[in-house]
Structures are given as C-alpha cells and as structure tokens.
A protein has these predicted regions:
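Sigma70-family region 2
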Residues: 11-12, 38, 48-66, 85-87
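C-terminal edge and immediately downstream basic/flexible tail or linker adjoining helix-turn-helix-like DNA-binding
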Residues: 5, 9, 91, 112-113, ...
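Structural recognition of an alpha-helix C-terminal capping motif at a helix-to-coil junction
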Residues: 31, 45-52, 65-77
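Helix-turn-helix DNA-binding module
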Residues: 1, 121-132, 136, 140-160, ...
Length: 179
C-alpha cells in the first residue's frame, strides 16, 4: 500500500516520494545487479540508470503491481544488457565490495568472508541465464512466476534454470567441479 501512495505522490511531483522509493529499494537492486554483474561499480551504474529512467517515466507509472518486482526486473534487464555489451571476463571479488540486501554484523562478516568469496566466484561461473534465475529468486525474493512473467518465459524454464544453477553451485562449492 505504501508503494502505491509513493507512486501517486511522485506522479504529483514529490521528490520526497522518489527519495523514499530509492531508500527503500536501492539495497535490493544493488544486490541483484552485483549478483548478475559481479562488479560493484557496474552494479551501481545500473541502479543509477534504472532510477533515472524510473524518474523520467513518472507520467507512465501505474500504482498497480509490485514496485519491488518492477524495479528489480528493470535492474536485471539492464544488467543483462550490460553483460551482453561488455562480454567481460569474470574476476575474483572482494567480499567487502559485495552489497547485501541486509547489512551483516561484524562477526558474521568475519565468519563468512571466505564463503562469500567462494560463492561469488562460483556464481560468476554460471551461465548468465542460470545466474539470473538464482539471483532474482534468492536476492530479490522474486517468485518463479514473477521471474517468468518479467522475462517472457515459461515458469518451467525459469525453474529449470534455477535448479541447474543451484546444482552447479553446489558442485563447485563442494569441489566436484572446477570453477
């Protein structure tokens, strides 16, 4: 309900509403973009560009539907476009660069540092379609149905990509496959 109210306020010219939308969704969008691009700077650029496009499309916005799903889908689509354009080599990521949807405690950062590094490396090795399904489902909390609708795919295709991605991640993290 708050999202509909924010959209209506934003359509009427409230910059405070846009700021609130940004504050509310920036972390999850950054987590999605980083999970797909494996590059913090590129992820920040994607989130910035999505918000600029969002702000410029105020008159076209509809208060119906999930704003979170809309923004994370826009983020995933732009990240996909950037991946296609860049065709860059994946690299080892410093877990300190990785944005999380929720800020971890210092103790959990210390305990999970190596695991995060291994997970980032393994995630970067997945085919893009599988990585996208995994990131959208786990980091953006999107349902398979919402992902399928946003990408114009069948729900079975999305579930298969997710399942294959999770299986490959599990194999890589258990040392069964080389990254």
């Amino acid at each position: 309900m708050e999202d509909r109210w924010l959209i209506l306020r934003f359509k009427r010219g409230s910059t405070d509403a846009l700021c609130r939308i940004y504050e509310k969704y920036e972390r999850v969008m950054l987590a999605v973009a980083f999970g797909l691009l494996n590059d913090r700077s590129a992820a920040e650029d994607v989130v910035h560009d999505v918000f600029v496009a969002f702000a410029q499309s105020a008159e076209k916005l509809s208060p119906a539907g999930s704003l979170r799903s809309y923004l994370t889908t826009c983020t995933a689509n732009l990240a996909r476009d950037r991946c296609r354009a860049i065709k860059r080599q994946s690299h080892i990521v410093d877990p300190a660069q990785a944005p999380n949807a929720e800020a971890p405690s210092p103790l959990s950062e210390v305990l999970q540092g190596e695991q995060l590094r291994q997970l980032s490396d393994a995630l970067a090795q997945l085919p893009y379609e599988q990585r996208e399904a995994v990131v959208l489902h786990l980091k953006a909390d999107m349902t398979f149905r919402a992902i399928a609708r946003a990408q114009g795919l069948s729900i079975n295709t999305v579930q298969s990509r997710y399942r294959y991605g999770i299986e490959k991640l599990r194999s890589m993290l258990n040392g069964e496959l080389e990254p």
